[in-house]
């Protein structure tokens, strides 16, 4: 009696009326809801990075802000747009009429498909690899159908479309993103003053963003919003009208406000503001302490590099004057500076055979080959590193304020990370051997730490460095010495090679958006990310809920080809699961999309978002197979390659492509295994 009451309560809560036919399979419905939630969790952990990965990578929003925005728009999108797409997932892959007399097999197949898709997406999220949720569920659906009914009823054309999308999606989206970013770079980023052109282009960018995304959302034909009753010409008219209105609003209201904001920030703090113009950046500060700390270090070819860390008199220096750090490397073209440098002493201690004494009494000992060339070289080049650069701040903080020698404490144990922006430069000017570093970097994983072995008087000493302590450790180590002459000769050769890589890292640093450009593109990127998240919620909730909808409707009606609409509460259930997955595990794939694959700036992030959205709209309308994930990855790689050819992690891109390749077979195999268990061990049909 109690079990009957509990059963009635469950069926009543689910809104099920006629349950006499499928009542023995209630356990399958409950199991399906549990697995569907896990699948929604995996979709949130992996696929949501498509929307906000680039926004987080460019620094426009924090990870927490991205999760909040994505939770809102994914949930709303799943409820308002998800019903339409669920029909395709439920009926577009297999012929469900084959299961008219064996409804329990279709229910078992839905559970198997969700399980196979969830397992592979969770594994991909653990590996930080963005994959297509749609391809996962398609492969899993084909897998269970092959076990249940063989090749009969499988629509193989869908599988062919998926294979084509591996190449069409990233290539087409990459080309469009590259074209858009080339336009932005040529007419805005490369200008001496990018603000005027940026303000002129702002209405066009907003209009395109609103028009493209609005058309994409309306074209889905979501029945809950009545879009299924709007003809195509009506959708185009509404989208264009909203785009024009948005452009006029931005031109007359947003652009003047943005211009005033930029000018206000520039005038309020001309020396400290990030919007400082180029002339002010070139000013030198003549008011320095009379006795600055001089550090002379060897670079390639035996040429001496002198690092000056001058101290400002904060009372007498005006706001327009800056602190500088100078390096002497080769010939100097400025006659005034040349005369000044010729009057300076090298401060190289000859008896110590190429050692340099720092202000705090520490010595830096160099190899014999380097020290001989140091002593014979008398040519210098004056190079300025200004106070707003990361290298200056690092030097000022570590070499002067921390008094050099004190930096060798706990901070010296931090690991050296791959793609370190300061390490190459540090090693180059300090003459440190780099063979072990490069060999390790070619084999080890990116997140592993490097240990550099340096031979000294006290035996082998391992020095670990990160981007904040590498310079300090290299300069302040008093016991650096090289035993073998082959290693000494290799040191100079390594430095020459490594300075090329250091110049490329400096080049990437200069390729960052100017602050005023970032200000122009920040809200645009947030807007495109929110639109993308809204559309993504409507599209990808079907990947998690589509099989559950089939399971629920079959159980409710006993008919595999029921025409009932998708319940809204089921879509909301999937949206909640997606949001939880995003909050718990979404940061992993977001890091891959926004940081690891290539550096992202607001301008490049906007180009990626808008062009990939446009690609999806065009390809969907002309019938080309397309994947949102593949489009986004293709855009990220192409724009990153256009910004800097060495900025893309091609090894990571190769791994992502391999993950795409195995997505369908792996999810299909897992689903087929679970379906075989259901068919031959549990249901025995």
Swiss-Prot record:
Region (Disordered): 489-511
GO CC terms, sorted: membrane
InterPro entries referenced in this protein's UniProt entry, alphabetically: Phos_transporter
Principal location listed in the UniProt entry: membrane
One Gene Ontology biological process: phosphate ion transmembrane transport
Keywords: Membrane, Phosphate transport, Symport, Transmembrane, Transmembrane helix, Transport
TM ranges: 21-41, 66-86, 106-126, 162-182, 207-227, 234-254, 517-537, 565-585, 606-626, 656-676
Coiled coil: none
Membrane topology term: Multi-pass membrane protein
Record bears the keyword Kinase: no
Entry superkingdom: Eukaryota
Family: Belongs to the inorganic phosphate transporter (PiT) (TC 2.A.20) family.
Biological role stated in the UniProt entry: Sodium-phosphate symporter which plays a fundamental housekeeping role in phosphate transport.
UniProt cross-references to PANTHER family, sorted A to Z: PHOSPHATE TRANSPORTER (PTHR11101), SODIUM-DEPENDENT PHOSPHATE TRANSPORTER 1 (PTHR11101:SF46)
Protein name listed in UniProt: Sodium-dependent phosphate transporter 1-B
Encoding gene per record: slc20a1-b
């Amino acid at each position: 009696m109690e079990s009957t009451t509990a059963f009635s309560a469950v069926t009543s809560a689910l809104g099920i009326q006629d349950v006499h036919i499928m009542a023995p399979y209630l356990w399958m419905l409950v199991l399906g809801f549990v697995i569907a939630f896990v699948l929604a969790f995996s979709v949130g952990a992996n696929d949501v990075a498509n929307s906000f990965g680039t926004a987080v990578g460019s620094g426009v929003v924090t990870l927490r802000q991205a999760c909040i925005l994505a939770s809102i728009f994914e949930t709303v999108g799943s409820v308002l747009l998800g019903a339409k797409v669920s029909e395709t997932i439920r009926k577009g892959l297999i012929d469900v009429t084959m299961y008219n007399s064996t409804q329990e097999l279709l229910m078992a197949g839905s559970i198997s498909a969700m399980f196979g898709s969830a397992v592979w997406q969770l594994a991909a999220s653990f590996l930080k690899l963005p994959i297509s949720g749609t391809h996962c569920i398609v492969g899993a659906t084909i897998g269970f159908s092959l076990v249940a009914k063989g090749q009969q009823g499988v629509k193989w054309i869908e599988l062919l479309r998926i294979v084509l999308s591996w190449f069409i999606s990233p290539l087409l989206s990459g080309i469009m993103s590259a074209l858009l970013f080339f336009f932005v770079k040529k007419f805005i980023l490369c200008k001496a003053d990018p603000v005027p052109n940026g303000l002129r282009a702002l209405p066009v960018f907003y209009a395109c963003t609103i028009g493209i995304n609005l058309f994409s959302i309306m074209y889905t034909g979501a029945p809950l919003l009545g879009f299924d009753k709007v003809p195509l010409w009506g959708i185009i008219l509404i989208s264009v009208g909203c785009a024009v209105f948005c452009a006029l609003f931005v031109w007359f209201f947003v652009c003047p406000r943005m211009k005033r904001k930029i000018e206000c920030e520039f005038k309020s703090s001309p020396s400290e503001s990030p919007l400082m113009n180029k002339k002010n950046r070139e000013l030198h500060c003549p008011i320095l302490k009379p006795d600055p700390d001089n550090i002379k270090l060897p670079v390639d070819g035996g040429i001496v590099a002198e690092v000056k860390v001058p101290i400002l008199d904060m009372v007498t220096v005006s706001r327009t004057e800056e602190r500088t750090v100078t390096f002497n490397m080769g010939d100097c073209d400025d006659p005034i500076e040349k005369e000044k440098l010729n009057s300076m002493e090298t401060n190289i201690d000859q008896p110590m055979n190429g050692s340099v004494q720092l202000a705090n009494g520490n010595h830096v000992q160099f190899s014999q080959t380097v020290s001989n060339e140091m002593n014979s070289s008398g040519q210098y080049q004056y190079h300025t590193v200004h106070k707003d650069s990361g290298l200056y701040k690092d030097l000022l903080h570590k070499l002067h304020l921390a008094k050099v020698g004190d930096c060798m404490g706990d901070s010296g144990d931090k690991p050296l990370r791959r793609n370190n922006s300061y390490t190459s430069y540090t090693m180059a000017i300090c003459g440190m051997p780099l063979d072990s570093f490069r060999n390790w970097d070619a084999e080890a994983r990116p997140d592993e730490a490097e240990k550099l072995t340096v031979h000294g008087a006290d035996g082998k000493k391992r020095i670990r460095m990160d981007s904040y302590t590498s310079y300090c450790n290299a300069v302040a180590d008093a016991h650096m010495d090289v035993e073998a002459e082959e290693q000494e000769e290799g040191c100079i050769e390594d430095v020459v090679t490594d300075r090329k890589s250091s110049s490329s890292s400096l080049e990437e640093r200069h390729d960052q958006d100017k602050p005023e450009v970032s200000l122009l593109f920040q809200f645009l990127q947030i807007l495109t990310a929110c639109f993308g998240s809204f559309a993504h919620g409507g599209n990808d909730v079907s990947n998690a809920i589509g099989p559950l909808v089939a399971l629920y409707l079959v159980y409710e009606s006993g008919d595999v080809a029921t025409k009932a609409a998708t319940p809204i509460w089921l879509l909301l259930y999937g949206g909640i699961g997606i949001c939880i997955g995003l909050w718990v595990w979404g940061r992993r794939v977001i890091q891959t999309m926004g940081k690891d694959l290539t550096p992202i700036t607001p301008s490049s992030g906007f180009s990626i978002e808008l062009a990939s959205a446009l690609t999806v709209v065009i390809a969907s309308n002309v019938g080309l197979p397309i994947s949102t994930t593949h489009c986004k990855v293709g855009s990220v790689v192409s724009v990153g390659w256009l910004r800097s050819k060495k900025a893309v992690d091609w090894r990571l891109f190769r791994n992502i492509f391999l993950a795409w390749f195995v997505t369908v077979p792996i999810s299909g195999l897992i689903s087929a295994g679970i379906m075989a268990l259901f068919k031959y061990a549990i249901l025995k049909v």
